[in-house]
Regions:
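An aromatic- and glycine-enriched ligand-binding surface/loop that stacks and positions planar moieties
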Residues: 1, 81, 105, 109, ...
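Active-site-proximal beta-strand/loop segments in catalytic clefts of secreted hydrolases
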Residues: 37, 86-87, 196-197
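Short linear capping/connector segments at secondary-structure termini
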Residues: 46-52, 85-92, 127-129
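All-alpha amphipathic helical-bundle segments outside canonical DNA-binding/catalytic cores
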Residues: 55, 59, 128-135
Length: 229
């Protein structure tokens, strides 16, 4: 209710969850990778083969993008936030201070520039089918355009959007309804630039596990009728 009234409080649980997830989990994981993985770091895959230098370079670029992605989300919600570039111990976490929005913006743009400078970051047309959902060059350009708009850098936003359009990797779906009713044409459509990829399991409440908590057992095998003692 505090958020709906435009008066969120520090005790608002939803905001606490967003803060913890973005800063303590997502950004922290990006920092762990950037701190510990270099092109020279020997890494072995599950099958026993070494991870190639090209793949490690791609991981690093993806981590820079994701860190920028989460920092922008934090900045839009909380304005001034602490800039953390490395893993922190318990003591360090108690002494960090917030940076002004201008510094956070510059930090975000720097991360995006690093990602775009990596030649091993592929374009959308270069992705294989099993890589759908990974960061692409067009995803970085699209996101940088969004960040630039919020900073009133309209020239950069226009330039980056044009790069995405000119890539030819995306197009509008003729039938708008297909975005919602067709897995093949909607979920993995040419309109999707960057998205979270989830498994689709029709028998499991048509792919939505939340339904089982709200419907009776006779409908979809849900748990809505369960009453714990």
């Amino acid at each position: 209710t505090e958020i709906a009234r435009g008066n969120p409080l520090p005790s608002t649980l939803l905001l606490e969850r967003v803060w913890n997830h973005r800063l303590q989990i997502a950004i922290s994981r990006c920092n762990v990778l950037l701190q510990n993985v270099t092109l020279e770091t020997p890494l072995i895959q599950a099958g026993g083969a070494y991870v190639s230098t090209e793949e490690k370079a791609r991981w690093i670029a993806e981590a820079h993008f994701l860190r920028a992605f989460y920092y922008f989300d934090l900045m839009m919600i909380f304005a001034n936030v602490p800039i953390i570039e490395e893993s922190l111990n318990v003591i360090d976490k108690t002494t960090i201070t917030k940076a002004p929005m201008e510094e956070v913006y510059d930090f975000i743009m720097k991360d995006l520039e690093v990602a775009l400078a990596e030649e091993n970051l592929p374009s959308a047309k270069e992705l294989s089918a099993d890589e759908f959902g990974r960061v692409t060059r067009e995803a970085v350009y699209s996101f940088r355009a969004r960040v630039a708009l919020f900073n009133k850098d309209y020239a950069l936003a226009k330039s980056d959007c044009k790069k995405v359009i000119d890539s030819g990797a995306y197009e509008l779906i003729p039938n708008y309804e297909d975005l919602f009713n067709s897995v093949e044409r909607g979920y993995m459509s040419k309109e999707c630039i960057f998205m979270t990829y989830n498994s689709y399991n029709p028998p499991y409440c048509n792919g939505n596990p939340a339904l089982i908590y709200f419907v009776g057992r006779g409908v979809t095998g849900g748990w809505g009728g369960e009453v714990p003692t």
